Every structure is written in structure tokens, then in C-alpha cells.
């Protein structure tokens, strides 16, 4: 049986890490695409040469033409300019919007049946633009944000409580940025909600608030430490978890930037919410009832995403006609 083809648009740090993870997990064959000649070919060859050591048989190739992604079952998009110190995700808008238009056209022509995962920032606006540019069904185009943000939240909580990350569950909703909403009420350690752990004396509310703030600034913290780039290991792992749920029809419940059409009171926008991912793409949107501060924070986050989308519409009004 032929292996699935997984196309990676963008061969930077995340793209290379994605390619290696696909091989290690034997998820399929890999096509690394990039406009920079030699870069995808070099990374593909380097990773392929690790396969005898790591023991995987995935085939890896590099390409500078979109024809190479033809028939891909999954496309993961990392193309675009990364954030630099002092640069907000929003600063990237006009540059990366043009990239999404080009990538969307390539996917539309060569991989119209693919499940597409967007990682490019500013995420919620870029995945909206990518879906418009590609013309793919909205349930087949998602943004990777919530899995990463929730993983950061889980890691910080596990570190605080000195427990295994496997026993910590956490949900982060809303836009992928400063307005994201880590939901303390729905986050647990071995099924015990965080508010109960505060009552049990495991931590204080003030300390929990600090962890929530650190989660919101998780990406910026790494950007400031690296000084020459942004996170790539955790983002790649997060996207692979989403791809694996689709390829293996695992029906995992994960927070992603999904297209909302009335859910959560949001219309024709991509916002981070929990969904079920199976072999049809987004098979169900899990609509959590939000109230009080959580609802206010989510609404603020949606408004921030709306502002980015409106800016996209002004920069590229032709996207609306697609």
C-alpha cells in the first residue's frame, strides 16, 4: 500500500523539524517545499541520511515547484517571515498575507483534497486568508495554535506541581496572541480542576495567575531568549499531533483555530476552540459554555482576531470573492 504524502510548505526550522518527526513516526513520505533553491533538497537529504540510524523508511524529497505537492493528503504550512525580537505577530500581517495567497493557489491546484494545517503568524488571520485563497472546505483547513498554547500551559502547570505532564490537561481558547484565553476552570491534574487544587493548598491563585500570564507570553519568551528566531520544536510537535489525528482517524479533541459559522456567536472567522479531528477534518466543534471573566476574555480575543481579518480584507479585497 502506498504511503501517504505529507507536504511541508516552508523548509525553515519548523519545516525541518516537521519532516524529521514525520519520519520518526512513520506517518508517510515527505515533500519539503521552499522558494529558496537547495534548502528543501538539502534538509530532505540530511534527514533521509538519518533514517538508517533512526530506523524509518519514509522517503523525503525537496522541491521548489508546487507540482511536487500533488496528491498530498496533508499539507502543513510554515512559509512566511518569522517573528523577530520586538516584533508583534500583527506586524507580520501584510508580508505573510501575500505568502498565503501564493501558497493557497498552489494547494488549490495541486492538493485540493488535502487536510491543511497553517502555522504561519499572525495565525488566526493567516489561516482565514489561506482558506479563502485555496478555496478548500473550511473543515479541511485549520490553524495550529491551541495545541501549542495548551502544551505550554500544561508544561508550566506540571512544573509547578512537580507531576507528570501526562496527568495535566489544559485548554487554551481564543486567538493565538496576547489575548488568548487559558481556561483555568477546565484545566485539571489527574481530573482535579485547578480551582480545587488551589483550595487543597497545592498552589495559590496569585501563582496560577502568573502561570496564565506566562502561557500568554510563551512565544515571546522564546523569541526573546533565542534573539534570532522563534520556537520550532513545540510548534512542530503540535502540528504533527493534529496531522496524526487526521491520518489515523483518531478523533482527538484538541483546541485549534477552526472556522466558526455561528458557534460561540462568531461568524466566518477562525478562532481557537476545541474540535474533534478525524479523517474528514474538523468533524465537530465543541461548544463550551463560557461565562463571566472567561466569556469577556474570549470576546476580547475574538475582537482582536476580527481586527486582523478586517485588515486582511483591506489589503487583499479580492480574497472575499473566492
From Swiss-Prot:
KW Amino-acid biosynthesis (keyword) present:
no
Say which family it is in.
Answer: Belongs to the LDH/MDH superfamily. MDH type 3 family.
Q: Binding positions for NAD(+)? A: 10-15, 34, 96, 119-121
Query: PANTHER family this protein is in?
Result: L-2-HYDROXYCARBOXYLATE DEHYDROGENASE (NAD(P)(+)), L-LACTATE DEHYDROGENASE
Q: Which GO terms describe its molecular function?
A: L-lactate dehydrogenase activity; L-malate dehydrogenase (NAD+) activity
Binding locations of substrate: 83, 89, 121, 152
Q: Which UniProt keywords apply?
A: NAD, Oxidoreductase, Tricarboxylic acid cycle
Q: Report disulfide bridges, numbered on this chain.
A: none
* Official protein name in the record: Malate dehydrogenase
This protein's source sits in the domain of life called Bacteria
- InterPro entries named in the record: L-lactate/malate_DH, Lactate/malate_DH_C, Lactate/malate_DH_N, Lactate_DH/Glyco_Ohase_4_C, Malate_DH_type3, NAD(P)-bd_dom_sf
> Which catalytic reaction applies to this protein?
(S)-malate + NAD(+) = oxaloacetate + NADH + H(+)
Q: Which residues form the signal peptide?
A: none
Asked if rRNA processing is a keyword of the record, the answer is: no
Give the residues annotated as active site. Answer: 176
Per the UniProt entry, the Enzyme Commission number(s) are 1.1.1.37
Q: Name one GO biological process term.
A: lactate metabolic process
- UniProt-listed Pfam families: Ldh_1_C (PF02866), Ldh_1_N (PF00056)
Top class in the EC scheme: oxidoreductase
What is this protein's function per UniProt? Catalyzes the reversible oxidation of malate to oxaloacetate.
Amino acid at each position: 500500500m502506498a504511503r501517504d504524502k505529507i507536504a511541508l510548505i516552508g523548509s525553515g526550522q519548523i519545516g525541518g523539524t516537521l519532516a524529521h518527526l514525520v519520519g520518526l513516526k512513520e506517518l508517510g513520505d515527505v515533500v519539503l517545499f521552499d522558494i529558496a533553491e537547495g534548502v528543501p533538497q538539502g534538509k530532505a537529504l540530511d534527514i533521509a541520511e538519518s533514517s538508517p540510524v533512526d530506523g524509518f523508511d519514509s522517503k523525503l524529497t525537496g522541491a521548489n515547484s508546487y507540482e511536487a505537492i500533488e496528491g498530498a493528503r496533508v499539507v502543513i504550512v510554515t512559509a512566511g517571515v518569522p517573528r523577530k525580537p520586538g516584533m508583534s505577530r500583527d506586524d507580520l500581517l501584510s508580508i505573510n498575507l501575500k505568502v498565503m495567497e501564493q501558497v493557497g493557489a498552489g494547494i488549490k491546484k495541486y492538493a485540493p483534497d488535502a487536510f491543511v494545517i497553517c502555522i504561519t503568524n499572525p495565525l488566526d488571520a493567516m489561516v482565514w486568508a489561506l482558506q479563502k485563497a485555496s478555496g478548500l472546505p473550511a473543515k479541511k483547513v485549520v490553524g495550529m495554535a491551541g495545541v501549542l498554547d495548551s502544551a505550554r500551559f500544561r508544561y508550566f502547570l506540571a512544573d509547578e506541581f512537580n507531576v507528570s505532564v501526562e496527568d495535566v490537561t489544559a485548554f487554551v481558547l481564543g486567538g493565538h496572541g496576547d489575548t488568548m484565553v487559558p481556561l483555568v476552570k477546565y484545566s485539571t491534574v489527574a481530573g482535579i480542576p485547578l480551582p480545587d487544587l488551589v483550595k487543597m493548598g497545592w498552589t495559590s491563585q496569585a501563582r496560577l495567575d502568573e502561570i496564565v500570564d506566562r502561557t500568554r507570553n510563551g512565544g515571546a519568551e522564546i523569541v526573546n531568549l533565542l534573539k534570532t528566531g522563534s520556537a520550532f520544536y513545540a510548534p512542530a510537535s503540535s502540528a504533527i499531533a493534529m496531522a496524526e489525528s487526521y491520518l489515523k482517524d483518531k478523533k482527538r479533541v484538541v483546541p485549534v483555530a477552526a472556522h466558526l459559522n455561528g458557534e460561540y456567536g462568531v461568524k466566518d472567522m477562525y478562532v481557537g476552540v476545541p474540535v474533534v479531528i478525524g479523517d474528514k477534518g474538523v468533524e465537530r466543534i465543541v461548544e463550551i459554555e463560557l461565562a463571566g471573566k472567561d466569556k469577556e476574555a474570549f470576546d476580547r480575543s475574538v475582537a482582536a482576531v476580527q481586527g486582523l481579518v478586517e485588515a486582511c480584507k483591506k489589503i487583499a479585497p479580492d480574497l472575499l470573492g473566492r
